[in-house]
């Protein structure tokens, strides 16, 4: 393959070939980075224009199994349904490129990104966007800006730009941002929870007295404070702008001549506009008071029909655009000029919140979280390691297990639409992934699997953030330990020139007519996840900083309400499985297990629990169907550990010891020696005379003198002394 351009970037290089392959496409770019090879193509349907007010853009990111020397698993040996990673990558590319298209562009456009070869250390999401942007830039569409992506990691406090996958795996931060040479367009960020060693923790006397990190370690979310995040974004933004300027300079000689594509006319009918403003301004304002999307749409539709009756010659589609424009003008003007929103709230005001936990008696845990006209029923189910979701990405060496899942469902009835419930849509997958990224850093699920399902019962904006809040409450309603209290809030913005207003807890109307969709999740002290999409072409870091701090205030308000609701949680003890973790001094492990596992079996049977002990650091995991059983088992184990250890006796052949008859069997009796070790007194060694029945001579609980006759491994043979 002949490469036209080689670009050296921070921690990586990229080679591009244009015009060698996929020549029938409107634009194509062949990208090689390391051993990764990606082809991105852009194709436009020049014969059709979609008249509706949206951009008919479709992005498909497709991974080929042969790229990693693999054959697809399962019954069918070919690539079929897109994986979650492929779908999420398609969404990232779509959201980054969509703002570039000219206003009024209505031609159906397909961007296809195919991975033909893969390097195990390559960041495929970054390369996918870079390849797609290159294909779009050199195409014959009137787009003159390059978009690219940068990922940022943090290891031991040090920032790494464009990390390898190995570095990203060790990082406490995963920040992905895209933009042009002038503006940020999209941000995705998450913190990654981990173990923090605190040498100031007091050591439990029952634990190993040595300062083992496993014993004094605590789980932390690594949430990122707002000031630190702004500093990181500033560094990444600088490199992003430089990189895009370089791309544009190097790609421009390969750009095709712009095709004279027809765009939708976006100039409004002045006659209609004047008439609607003069005669129906108050009707539109009244419709805006209908907060539900279905009610608002019905009111505007009825207004349209009312006008058409008297203005039969008018085109209804044009009238719809005019009414929509006046509505948008009203919403934005009221916010910018009066600093009041359509529902009467102040710019930073949060809608009323109500929280009910464990509303489903047979579920392990649940929460009904309502904020304004947005309502999420979040249900939690606990399982073991075998319940984890198995998956294998193209860059993985083998099968991976996902033990924390968040599934988001958005049925049509939640917005008053008569539509059947079908398969999972891209938006549902994306919202579930955002909620997962928000909550995953605060839980440590060793040996457990947790599935959260969010059923959106009503939606008027911010349903993904309701999922985060409801998801946290469901975790607490299941008595799962968390390192932070996490809430989510959706921020918005309306701007006109230098004038702007930042909105907290946006509803659907403000999302639709605003310039920014910015979702932020975290604790009172920092951010665990965020997702930002710009609709106006870019955002400055100063405005972003203001939005982050306003979001922090909103989160604190929501967290206060959630913490009050936590006090009233009543657990579903009848169905809720329980797990407890604690540490013991590893030297006591033998006492807990007992000879041939006798002691631990007795604990398991008595308290109906499962017990797992790490022999290296003494970590004990107790799992059972009831919390009371788990607690009783823990207390029993701690009782064994707290009992002073008897000095270990070195038994020698010929030694005489006192022992207790523990159990009588047909072939003899088991005798408990002074340090708790059992030895076998065979029937032939009980007397010089023939013994027909052991119980004729010995009684259980009787104390006798015995002689050590023989050692065989851990087995001790005894005789009557």
From Swiss-Prot:
<keyword id="KW-0963">Cytoplasm</keyword>
<dbReference type="InterPro" id="IPR004087">
    <property type="entry name" value="KH_dom"/>
</dbReference>
<feature type="binding site">
    <location>
        <position position="517"/>
    </location>
    <ligand>
        <name>Mg(2+)</name>
    </ligand>
</feature>
<protein>
    <recommendedName>
        <fullName>Polyribonucleotide nucleotidyltransferase</fullName>
        <ecNumber>2.7.7.8</ecNumber>
    </recommendedName>
</protein>
<comment type="similarity">
    <text>Belongs to the polyribonucleotide nucleotidyltransferase family.</text>
</comment>
<dbReference type="InterPro" id="IPR020568">
    <property type="entry name" value="Ribosomal_Su5_D2-typ_SF"/>
</dbReference>
<dbReference type="Pfam" id="PF00013">
    <property type="entry name" value="KH_1"/>
</dbReference>
<feature type="binding site">
    <location>
        <position position="511"/>
    </location>
    <ligand>
        <name>Mg(2+)</name>
    </ligand>
</feature>
<feature type="domain" description="S1 motif">
    <location>
        <begin position="654"/>
        <end position="721"/>
    </location>
</feature>
<dbReference type="Pfam" id="PF03726">
    <property type="entry name" value="PNPase"/>
</dbReference>
<dbReference type="Pfam" id="PF03725">
    <property type="entry name" value="RNase_PH_C"/>
</dbReference>
<dbReference type="Pfam" id="PF00575">
    <property type="entry name" value="S1"/>
</dbReference>
<dbReference type="InterPro" id="IPR003029">
    <property type="entry name" value="S1_domain"/>
</dbReference>
<dbReference type="InterPro" id="IPR001247">
    <property type="entry name" value="ExoRNase_PH_dom1"/>
</dbReference>
<comment type="function">
    <text>Involved in mRNA degradation. Catalyzes the phosphorolysis of single-stranded polyribonucleotides processively in the 3'- to 5'-direction.</text>
</comment>
<dbReference type="GO" id="GO:0004654">
    <property type="term" value="F:polyribonucleotide nucleotidyltransferase activity"/>
</dbReference>
<dbReference type="InterPro" id="IPR004088">
    <property type="entry name" value="KH_dom_type_1"/>
</dbReference>
<dbReference type="GO" id="GO:0000287">
    <property type="term" value="F:magnesium ion binding"/>
</dbReference>
<dbReference type="InterPro" id="IPR036612">
    <property type="entry name" value="KH_dom_type_1_sf"/>
</dbReference>
<dbReference type="Pfam" id="PF01138">
    <property type="entry name" value="RNase_PH"/>
</dbReference>
<dbReference type="InterPro" id="IPR027408">
    <property type="entry name" value="PNPase/RNase_PH_dom_sf"/>
</dbReference>
<keyword id="KW-0808">Transferase</keyword>
<dbReference type="InterPro" id="IPR012340">
    <property type="entry name" value="NA-bd_OB-fold"/>
</dbReference>
<dbReference type="GO" id="GO:0006402">
    <property type="term" value="P:mRNA catabolic process"/>
</dbReference>
<dbReference type="GO" id="GO:0005829">
    <property type="term" value="C:cytosol"/>
</dbReference>
<dbReference type="InterPro" id="IPR012162">
    <property type="entry name" value="PNPase"/>
</dbReference>
<dbReference type="InterPro" id="IPR036345">
    <property type="entry name" value="ExoRNase_PH_dom2_sf"/>
</dbReference>
<dbReference type="GO" id="GO:0000175">
    <property type="term" value="F:3'-5'-RNA exonuclease activity"/>
</dbReference>
<dbReference type="GO" id="GO:0003723">
    <property type="term" value="F:RNA binding"/>
</dbReference>
<keyword id="KW-0548">Nucleotidyltransferase</keyword>
<dbReference type="InterPro" id="IPR036456">
    <property type="entry name" value="PNPase_PH_RNA-bd_sf"/>
</dbReference>
<keyword id="KW-0479">Metal-binding</keyword>
<feature type="domain" description="KH">
    <location>
        <begin position="577"/>
        <end position="637"/>
    </location>
</feature>
<dbReference type="InterPro" id="IPR015848">
    <property type="entry name" value="PNPase_PH_RNA-bd_bac/org-type"/>
</dbReference>
<keyword id="KW-0694">RNA-binding</keyword>
<keyword id="KW-0460">Magnesium</keyword>
<dbReference type="InterPro" id="IPR015847">
    <property type="entry name" value="ExoRNase_PH_dom2"/>
</dbReference>
<dbReference type="GO" id="GO:0006396">
    <property type="term" value="P:RNA processing"/>
</dbReference>
């Amino acid at each position: 393959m002949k490469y036209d351009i080689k670009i050296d970037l921070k921690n990586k290089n990229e080679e591009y070939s244009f015009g060698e392959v996929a020549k029938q496409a409107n634009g194509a770019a062949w990208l090689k980075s390391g051993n990764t090879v990606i082809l991105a193509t852009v194709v436009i349907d020049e014969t059709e224009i979609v008249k509706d007010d949206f951009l008919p853009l479709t992005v498909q990111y497709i991974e080929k199994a042969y790229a990693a020397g693999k054959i697809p698993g399962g019954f069918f040996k070919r690539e079929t349904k897109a994986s979650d990673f492929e779908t999420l990558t398609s969404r990232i590319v779509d959201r980054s490129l969509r703002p570039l298209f000219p206003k009024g562009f209505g031609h159906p456009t397909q961007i296809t990104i195919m991975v033909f070869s893969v390097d195990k250390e390559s960041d495929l999401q970054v390369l996918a966007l870079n390849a797609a942007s290159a294909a779009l830039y050199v195409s014959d569409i009137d787009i003159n800006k390059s978009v690219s992506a940068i990922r940022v990691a943090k290891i031991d406090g040090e920032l790494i730009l464009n990390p390898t996958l190995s570095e990203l795996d060790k990082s406490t931060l995963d920040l992905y941002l895209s933009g042009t040479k002038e503006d940020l367009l999209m941000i995705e960020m998450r913190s990654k929870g981990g173990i923090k060693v605190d040498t100031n923790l007091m050591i439990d006397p029952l634990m190993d007295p040595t300062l083992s990190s496993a014993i004094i370690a605590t789980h932390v979310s690594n949430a990122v404070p707002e000031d630190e995040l702004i500093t990181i974004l500033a560094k990444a933004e600088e490199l992003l702008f430089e990189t895009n300027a370089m791309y544009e300079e190097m790609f421009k000689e390969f750009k095709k001549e712009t095709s004279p594509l027809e765009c939708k006319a976006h100039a409004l009918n002045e006659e209609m506009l004047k008439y609607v403003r003069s005669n129906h301004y108050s009707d539109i304002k009244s419709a805006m008071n209908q907060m539900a999307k279905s009610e608002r749409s019905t009111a505007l539709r009825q207004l349209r029909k009312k006008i058409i009756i008297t203005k039969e010659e008018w085109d209804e589609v044009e009238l719809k655009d005019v009414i929509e424009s006046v509505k948008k003008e009203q919403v934005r003007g009221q916010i910018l000029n009066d600093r009041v929103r359509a529902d009467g709230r102040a710019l930073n005001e949060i809608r009323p919140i109500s929280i009910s936990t464990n509303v489903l008696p047979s579920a392990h845990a649940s929460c009904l979280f309502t904020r304004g006209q947005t309502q999420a029923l979040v249900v939690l189910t606990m399982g073991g390691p075998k319940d984890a979701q198995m998956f294998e990405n193209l860059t993985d060496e083998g099968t991976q297990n996902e033990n924390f899942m968040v599934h988001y469902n958005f049925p049509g009835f939640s917005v008053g639409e008569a539509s059947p419930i079908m398969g999972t849509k891209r938006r549902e997958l994306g919202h579930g992934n955002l909620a997962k990224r928000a909550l995953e850093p605060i839980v440590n699920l060793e040996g457990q699997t947790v599935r959260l399902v969010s059923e959106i019962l009503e939606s008027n904006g911010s349903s993904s953030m309701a999922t985060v809040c409801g998801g946290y409450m469901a975790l607490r309603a299941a008595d799962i330990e968390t390192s932070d209290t996490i809430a989510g809030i959706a921020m918005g913005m309306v701007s006109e020139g230098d004038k702007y207003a930042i909105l907290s807890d946006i509803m659907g109307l403000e999302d639709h007519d605003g310039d920014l969709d910015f979702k932020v999740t975290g604790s009172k002290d920092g951010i665990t996840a965020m997702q930002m999409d710009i609709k106006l072409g870019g955002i400055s870091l100063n405005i972003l900083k203001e939005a982050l701090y306003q979001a922090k205030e909103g989160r604190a308000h929501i967290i206060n309400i959630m913490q009050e609701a936590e006090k009233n949680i009543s657990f579903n003890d009848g169905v809720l499985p329980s797990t407890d973790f604690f540490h013991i001094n590893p030297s006591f492990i033998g006492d807990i297990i007992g000879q041939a596992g006798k002691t631990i079996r007795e604990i398991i049977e008595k308290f109906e629990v499962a017990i797992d002990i790490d022999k290296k650091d003494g970590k004990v995991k107790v799992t059972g169907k009831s919390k009371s059983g788990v607690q009783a088992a823990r207390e029993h184990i701690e009782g064994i550990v707290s009992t002073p250890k008897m000095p270990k006796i070195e038994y020698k052949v010929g030694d005489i010891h006192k022992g207790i008859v523990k159990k009588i069997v047909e072939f003899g009796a088991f005798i408990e020696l002074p340090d708790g070790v059992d030895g076998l007194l065979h029937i032939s060694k009980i007397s010089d005379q023939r013994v027909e029945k052991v119980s004729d001579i010995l009684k259980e609980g009787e104390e006798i003198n015995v002689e050590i006759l023989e050692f065989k491994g851990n087995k001790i043979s005894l005789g009557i002394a």
